[in-house]
Amino acid sequence: MSSSAEQNNWLSDLRCYQAIKNSLAGRHDHIAKAYQQQWPNFIIIGSAKSATTTLATVLGRHPEIQISRSMEPKFFGRNYRRGWEWYGQQFSGAKRHRLRGEASTMYTSSYRSYQHTPQLIRHHLGIIPLIYLVRHPLRRIESHWRHWRGRVNDCPPFHQLLESKALKQRVVEASLYHQQLMRYRRWFPAESIHCLTTEELNANPVESLNIILKFLGQPPDASKLLLSEKLPVTNSAGSKGRREVGQPQWTDELKKQTIEIIQPDSEQFLETLQWPKNTWKWD
């Protein structure tokens, strides 16, 4: 990336940070409240490359649920400076749905303009239901790198996963689920955050969706949202570019070093949620 592009990104991040800081100080409250009827009342906060698009697509089939026009508006972060009118337009439409949601997976990233996302959501939206969908940490990293490699010209090769600051921050740290969960638990009670695995969603879609619907205050009748009780198998937006990038190969040393970073956090995450210790296998 050129120094000019880096400088522009730095200036954009600085302006976004200043806007978010002003917002958290209450200086935008009067603007935000003008669009209160269009605010989302639930958010899928992550994680990236964990079937969040699939989940949002299926939930959007429910007659009482509206998903934002841009499934990942990234408003409580990089796009905050676009303003509340822009965000409200994400949920505009002739019908007023009981539930309105979005699925910006960068909300479970502390990268750059997303450092204050949990606090920003809580400040403006209050305590709302949050859904945190997580996947085997290593499989998620592989998919995330392929996604980035297929879209970003200067994305470093996979063997630089831990050497590249950008890859480590954007790709590896997104698999630190406990760290990300604790950022939200600082601002939201545990009962307002529903966590589930991609593996469970894929294996038992009807049961998983019924639990989510109940969590959102809707009757648990997910069978009407699925065709032949199966989840959609394609994600054209997320697959663009990724299909052109081969599956990355781990060297023994890279895998060992990555597991050393991620496994302690994963074990804390599983313990916090009282999930089985063998939820994910590392060999």
Where are the predicted features?
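PAPS-dependent sulfotransferase catalytic core
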Residues: 1-110, 124, 128, 148-151, ...
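Generic structural signal for small/hydrophobic residues in well-ordered secondary structure
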Residues: 51-52, 101, 121, 130, ...
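Generic structural signal for well-ordered alpha-helices
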Residues: 84-88, 118, 181-182
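Surface-exposed cleft-lining segments at the edges of enzyme active sites
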Residues: 103-111, 160-172, 245-256
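The conserved 3'-phosphoadenosine-5'-phosphosulfate
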Residues: 172, 182-267, 275-283
